[in-house]
Swiss-Prot record:
CDD domains: AAA, RecA-like_ClpB_Hsp104-like. Residues 555-765 are annotated as: NBD2. Residues 341-545 are annotated as: Linker. ATP 1 binds at G206, E207, P208, G209, V210, G211, K212, T213. Residues 6-71 are annotated as: Repeat 1. One of its GO terms (cellular component) is cytoplasm. The gene is clpB. Keywords: ATP-binding, Chaperone, Coiled coil, Cytoplasm, Nucleotide-binding, Repeat, Stress response. This is Chaperone protein ClpB. One of its GO terms (molecular function) is ATP hydrolysis activity.
Length: 857
């Protein structure tokens, strides 16, 4: 008999039966081998068929194993197995039954029907189990749904809805869906479209993270609770699993067959099913090959006739890119636009979800934490949408607290490591017998005993606190289950069970929870089980790098003494340092304008007076690293076309995918100092781009993304008017010099640019005393570099004064000083070190001899 007369599943089962016979040293493939192979096969229709017939599959499997054990074994046959005569007869009978049923192919369930008619041991076993030809035929009709077997893959396409969809109404019944708060208008509009006679297919469109899928889940929950119009009551909402539909479709036409079987089953349900297609744009082009039809085109006829009640969900960009390009598909859907919820709506949504997250993480989420998550994420996370970004903050903050409870607290962990370290030292000293070692051992033993006692006390506290925290978790879980049971009872109309739960079990559990929570309220030493606004702020700071957590006393003190810290590196520029320090303090105190950068400054002054140095010092103060500064040399942007490098090339140009130099840097580090050095050398068009940054704290890059500059300090430096400063420094005060410089600046920059800068600061030329202070800083850095190599450097006052005189130049500022230090100190020292005339252990003194600085050791 030809194997290609069997369905593909049946062919695989025959191969499995052959392997089974071979493995058990049987010479012939008997019907029992094939029956075992069909039972064990993944996705075979035999198991569901036997379940319909109320047959205990486990009992049947053990009986078949006994039959296999009784078959004769033959050794040394070289792996040659053949079909037995009983098997051949069974196949002939299968062929006969298939022809009677007008099937083009022989499917697996036909073998079960043939086995019942068989007079062999397999037929006898089925008769004992009470199976008759009539019963099996009825069950086969039920599984097939009135379909003939006209395709080799017919078995795979059966029960397509169970295989390729997820039942959202069933999940809602089981309480597996999160509650949907608000969104009443959108759900009502969706129901309104579903009630139409034709084109009753809403497509929910919105930005990622605004809650499109949640609207469909809300619809499923309303259907379960009978809170929908009469026309939608009793409907099922099924979510199409595109992954399952495409996975394993190896040959052309297989994907289309699967989709067609889903559509056929949906049409049989006669409008009782609402099909939800998440990421609707994936249907356009899915399964598209040369000469084949894609999924979108296969859906069109069913959508137009109103046979298929479909709800789609996709983002605005993907709707424009895929759906709008196909007007025939677009007109079959009705748009339901979903906007981002407000901060107030988000707080309501988070309050509704709070219990689910508390139950999952076994921690308590306070109301200030919910308010902080909504407001802080709205202000500081600009590239994502509410409520998704706020839920993420709550989830991660709760996760971090749970992690601290489950793992050892930091204090306990440090103490344990210290004890291990002391024990290693104790072991090493116990082998030594000199007086010093014995003395050290005695003090070590005392220290070790003290640490172990401290560790034992802390561990006891930790275990007690852990036990106290876990007490409420069981009560919360039981309370959640009781509420779910009450909901089931309400739907089933079981009033006695409902009242028993509502007035007995639930109030009792709530009372227990109150008592347990009060016990937990006692002050914890090591652990905490509450998510507060502090934890939310910490998580946000880690995600974005923006410091939004409450300031510790040390940080407040540091900010109040900010000028003092900056003056240690920036000498003689009092006004500039004050202006910058005030801007940072305003920002950290929360008083700065939330729609503008923290501060925008234009630093003017001659070369070498500390304009760039102040930016570096500020970055170091704020981030403990000068690398946190985004430095852009504006002399690179002298040509008109180079402006595109800041925000990224426009579409169609090379480098479009790479993004802009400025925008990408700020997207990666939203909290940073941006230094636009030598700004007057840039092309005038660059300033048109900066207007938006300085005014609204935002900039749109080449790919249309909005980049947030509200947490940056923008500093621009320029040498404009430096000649006026040099000429009038001795004669005019600071205000007079500033007016002189601004005359030059207003001729170069446009008024709308200068008007948007917060402060224009004029830097003073440096005096002899300033240069001396800078020389001390520079020589201190040199001493630190030498210390790394084991040399100690000491500078005499006379040497310091001499180097300040040599390096002083009122025109070029502090830069000549660097050159003077290199020539007079660093070069001779390098020669001395290489020659070996100075030694690492002894102190090197820089002294003046005959107006020359010499190294003396």
């Amino acid at each position: 008999m030809r194997l290609d007369r069997f369905t593909s599943k049946f062919q695989i089962a025959i191969s499995d039966a052959q392997s089974l016979a071979l493995g058990r040293d049987h010479q012939y493939i008997e019907p029992v081998h094939l029956m075992v192979a069909l039972l064990d096969q993944n996705g075979s229709p035999i198991r569901p068929l036997l379940t319909i017939l109320n047959v205990d599959v486990t009992h049947l499997r053990s009986k078949l194993s006994e039959m296999l054990d009784r078959l004769p074994k033959v050794s040394g046959i070289g792996g040659d197995v053949q079909l037995s005569s009983a098997m051949g007869a069974m196949f002939n009978l299968c062929d006969k039954i298939a022809q009677k049923r007008q099937d083009a192919y022989i499917s697996s369930e036909i073998f079960l029907l043939a086995a019942i008619e068989d007079r062999g041991p397999l037929g006898q076993l089925f008769k004992e189990l009470g199976l008759t030809e009539q019963k099996v035929s009825q069950a086969i009709e039920q599984i097939r749904g009135g379909q003939k077997v006209n395709d080799q893959n017919a078995e795979e396409l059966r029960q397509a809805l169970e295989k390729f969809t997820i039942d959202l109404t069933e999940r809602a019944e089981q309480g597996k869906l999160d509650p949907v708060i608000g969104r009443d208008d959108e759900i009502r509009r969706t129901i309104q479209v579903l009630q139409r006679r034709t084109k009753n297919n809403p497509v929910i469109i919105g930005e990622p993270g605004v809650g499109k899928t949640a609207i469909v889940e809300g619809l499923a929950q309303r259907i379960i609770n009978n809170e929908v119009p009469e026309g939608l009551r009793g409907r099922r909402v099924l979510s199409l699993d595109m992954g399952a539909l495409v996975a394993g479709a190896k040959y052309r036409g297989e994907f289309e067959e699967r989709l067609k079987s889903v559509l056929n089953e949906l049409s049989k349900e006669e409008g009782n099913i609402i099909l939800f297609i998440d990421e609707l744009h994936t249907m356009v082009g899915a399964g598209k090959g040369e000469g084949s039809m894609d999924a979108g085109n296969m859906l069109k006829p069913a959508l137009a006739r109103g046979e298929l009640h479909c709800v789609g969900a996709t983002t605005l960009d993907e709707y424009r890119q895929y759906i709008e390009k196909d007007p025939a598909l677009e007109r079959r859907f009705q748009k339901v636009l979903v906007d981002e919820p407000t901060v107030e709506d988000t707080i309501a949504i988070l309050r509704g979800l709070k219990e689910r997250y508390e139950l999952h993480h076994h921690v308590e989420i306070t109301d200030p934490a919910i308010v902080a998550a909504a407001s802080l994420s709205h202000r500081y996370v600009s590239d994502r949408q509410l409520p998704d970004k706020a839920i993420d903050l709550i989830d991660e903050a709760a996760s971090s607290i749970r992690m601290q409870i489950d793992s050892k607290p930091e204090a306990l962990d440090k103490l344990e490591r210290k004890i291990i370290q002391l024990k290693i030292e104790q072991q090493a000293l116990s082998n030594e017998h000199d007086e010093a070692s014995e003395k050290r051992l005695r003090s070590l033993n005392e220290e070790l005993n003290e640490k172990e006692r401290e560790f034992a006390e802390l561990e006891e506290i930790w275990n007690a606190e852990k036990a106290a925290l876990s007490g409420t978790q069981h009560i919360k879980a039981a309370l959640e289950q009781a509420r779910m049971d009450m909901e089931f009872a309400r739907r089933a109309g079981d009033l006695s069970r409902m009242s028993e739960l509502q007035y007995g079990r639930i109030p009792e559990l709530e009372k227990q929870l109150d008592l347990a929570t009060q016990a937990e309220m006692q002050e914890m030493t090591l652990l905490k089980n509450k998510v507060t606004d502090n934890e939310i702020a910490e998580v946000l700071s880690k995600q974005t790098g923006i410091p939004v957590s409450k300031m510790l006393e040390a940080e407040k003190e540091k900010l109040l003494r900010m000028e003092e810290v900056l003056h240690k590196r920036v000498i003689g520029q009092k006004e500039a340092v004050e202006v910058v320090a005030n801007a940072i303090r305003r920002s950290r105190a929360g008083l700065s304008d939330p729609n503008k950068p923290i501060g925008s400054f234009l630093f003017l002054g001659p070369t070498g007076v500390g304009k760039t140095e102040l930016c570096k010092t500020l970055a170091n103060f704020m981030f403990d690293s000068e690398d946190a500064m985004v430095r852009i040399d504006m002399s690179e942007f002298m040509e008109k076309h180079s402006v595109a490098r800041l925000v990224g090339a426009p579409p169609g140009y090379v480098g479009y995918e790479e993004g802009g130099y400025l925008t990408e840097a700020v997207r990666r580090k939203p909290y940073s100092v941006i230094l636009l050095d030598e700004v007057e050398k840039a092309h005038p068009d660059v300033f048109n781009i900066l207007l938006q940054v300085l005014d609204d704290g935002r900039l749109t890059d080449g790919q249309g993304r909005t980049v947030d500059f509200r947490n940056t300090v923008v500093i621009m430096t320029s040498n404009l008017g430096s000649s006026r400063i040099q000429e009038n420094f001795a004669m005019l005060d600071y205000q007079g010099i500033k007016e002189q410089v601004m005359e030059v600046v207003t001729k170069h920059f446009r008024p709308e640019f200068l008007n948007r800068v917060d402060e224009t600061v004029v830097f003073h030329p440096l005096s002899q005393d300033h240069i001396k202070s800078i020389a001390a800083i520079q020589l201190n850095r040199l001493a630190n570099r030498m210390e790394e190599h084991g040399y100690q450097l000491e500078v005499s006052d006379k040497a310091l004064e001499l180097i300040a005189q040599v390096g002083f130049d009122p025109v070029y500022g502090a830069r000549p000083l660097k050159r003077a230090i290199q020539q007079s100190i660093e070069n001779p020292l390098a020669k001395s070190i290489l020659a070996g005339s100075v030694l690492p252990d002894k102190k090197i003194q820089l002294i003046v001899n005959n107006d020359q600085i010499v190294a003396h050791q």
